[in-house]
């Protein structure tokens, strides 16, 4: 008699996705990050739910309600620290997951890749509205600066900004709607992640050599479930260590001051995981141009599959393209550093050079390197 997991309508779906899924035998630790992102999402939804039970989305009491969570709620300090630092780990896993996709040519699964880019945008929006909720100085001014960027939209910009604010400045209406969005978006992300998996399982996973692996597949369970559990343990140990020993390491000290519309902080900057895009935004001395560059810095990922010129899928056997890939990694690190620096020389020019290099790598250098490698190898 067939096992229940293979016949039950619901269990069969889970079985095909997590137990009997044929997986390439040679996938490395870089393929762990999908499941780690699932763990991050589950952790964020769970801790966020408990925080929402005690949080008050009102300008008069939001800051105090967060203090109340940390002081008076049972393990509230831990829940809050896990949630705040969980966001950082979420983005670390996201960026490593995207880097893996770029290195091994996983972007050639176009539907899966594009849903992934939409997921990235959703996670970024969720993190942004979430950062506003504690209603500290950086929350308030970050919200003011970033929402104000929409005023660069021709003709309807100002109306659009006031519509999002729910008034003539960032105020109670803004905070209330941002809380509503922050509560809703994780469930939208969950649905999009299911779609992401659905498209992935139509094609099967890529592998480190970028070749068809249909002849050499093994079942997901037990091999990769146990391999993923090791990743889970490392991630949870890292997250709990950060939350317990140095919970404010990645935060901004300004956010311990309640929001004050009368006092502008000396340096307004977002959380570390947005700094690379913020640096690109600031590198263009024009509001609309900066906003378009900011959008392009993320949306350029959607163009990557169409600019793939190499006859090989992965970068495993392509040293020239590997050099460009690591140049891109270094460039993003430089942009992240510049985004946290004041807008003055020499940081302005460094940011501009790094921004030009960022777009050049995607649009010109990677396609050229792929074409050159084909020529050298005699693949026409």
Curated annotation (Swiss-Prot):
Taxonomic superkingdom: Eukaryota
InterPro entries assigned: Cyt_b/b6_C, Cyt_b/b6_C_sf, Cyt_b/b6_N, Cytb/b6-like_sf, Cytochrome_b, Cytochrome_b_C_euk/bac, Cytochrome_b_N_euk/bac, Di-haem_cyt_TM
GO biological process: mitochondrial electron transport, ubiquinol to cytochrome c
Binding site for a ubiquinone: 201
Record-linked Gene3D superfamilies: Cytochrome Bc1 Complex, Chain C
Compartment(s): Mitochondrion inner membrane
Cofactor note: Binds 2 heme b groups non-covalently.
TM helices/strands, residue ranges: 33-53, 77-98, 113-133, 178-198, 226-246, 288-308, 320-340, 347-367
Record's bilayer topology term: Multi-pass membrane protein
Binding locations of heme b b566: 97, 196
Keyword set includes Ligase: no
GO cellular component: mitochondrial inner membrane; respiratory chain complex III
Keywords (A to Z) from UniProt: Electron transport, Heme, Iron, Membrane, Metal-binding, Mitochondrion, Mitochondrion inner membrane, Respiratory chain, Transmembrane, Transmembrane helix, Transport, Ubiquinone
Keyword Nucleus applies: no
Known partners and oligomeric status: The cytochrome bc1 complex contains 3 respiratory subunits (MT-CYB, CYC1 and UQCRFS1), 2 core proteins (UQCRC1 and UQCRC2) and probably 6 low-molecular weight proteins.
Additional detail: Heme 1 (or BL or b562) is low-potential and absorbs at about 562 nm, and heme 2 (or BH or b566) is high-potential and absorbs at about 566 nm.
Family membership: Belongs to the cytochrome b family.
PANTHER family registered for this protein in UniProt: CYTOCHROME B
Function: Component of the ubiquinol-cytochrome c reductase complex (complex III or cytochrome b-c1 complex) that is part of the mitochondrial respiratory chain. The b-c1 complex mediates electron transfer from ubiquinol to cytochrome c. Contributes to the generation of a proton gradient across the mitochondrial membrane that is then used for ATP synthesis.
Protein name: Cytochrome b
């Amino acid at each position: 008699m067939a096992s229940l997991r293979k016949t039950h309508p619901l269990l069969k779906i889970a079985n095909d996705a997590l137990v009997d899924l044929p997986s390439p035998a040679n996938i490395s630790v870089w393929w762990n990050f999908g499941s780690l992102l699932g763990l991050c999402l589950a952790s964020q939804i769970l801790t966020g739910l408990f925080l929402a039970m005690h949080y008050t989305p009102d300008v008069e009491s939001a800051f105090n309600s967060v203090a109340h969570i940390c002081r008076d709620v049972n393990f509230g300090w831990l829940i809050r620290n896990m949630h705040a630092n969980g966001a950082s780990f979420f983005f670390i896993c996201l960026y490593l997951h995207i880097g893996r996709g770029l290195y091994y040519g996983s972007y050639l699964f176009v539907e899966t890749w594009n849903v992934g880019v939409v997921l990235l945008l959703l996670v970024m929006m969720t993190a942004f509205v979430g950062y506003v909720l504690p209603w500290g100085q950086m929350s308030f001014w970050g919200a003011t600066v970033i929402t104000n960027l929409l005023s660069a939209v021709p003709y309807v910009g100002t109306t659009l900004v006031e519509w999002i604010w729910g008034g003539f400045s960032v105020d109670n209406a803004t905070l209330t709607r941002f809380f509503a969005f922050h509560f809703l978006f994780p469930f939208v992300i969950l649905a999009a992640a299911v779609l992401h998996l659905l498209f992935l399982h139509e094609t099967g996973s890529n592998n480190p050599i970028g070749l068809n692996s249909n002849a050499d597949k093994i079942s997901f369970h037990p091999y990769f479930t146990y391999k993923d559990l090791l990743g889970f343990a490392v991630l949870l140990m890292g997250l709990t260590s950060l939350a317990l020993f140095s919970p404010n390491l990645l935060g901004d000290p300004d956010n311990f001051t309640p929001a004050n519309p009368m006092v502008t902080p000396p340096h307004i900057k977002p959380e570390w995981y947005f700094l690379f895009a913020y640096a690109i935004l600031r590198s263009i001395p024009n509001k609309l141009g900066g906003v378009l560059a900011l959008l392009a810095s993320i949306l350029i990922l959607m163009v990557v599959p169409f600019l793939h010129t190499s006859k090989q899928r992965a970068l495993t056997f392509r040293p020239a393209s590997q050099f460009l890939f690591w140049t891109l990694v270094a460039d993003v690190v430089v942009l992240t550093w510049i985004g946290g620096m004041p807008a003055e020389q020499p940081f302005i020019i460094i940011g501009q050079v790094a921004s030009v290099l960022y777009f050049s790598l995607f649009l010109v250098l990677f396609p050229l390197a792929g074409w050159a490698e084909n020529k050298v190898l005699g693949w026409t």
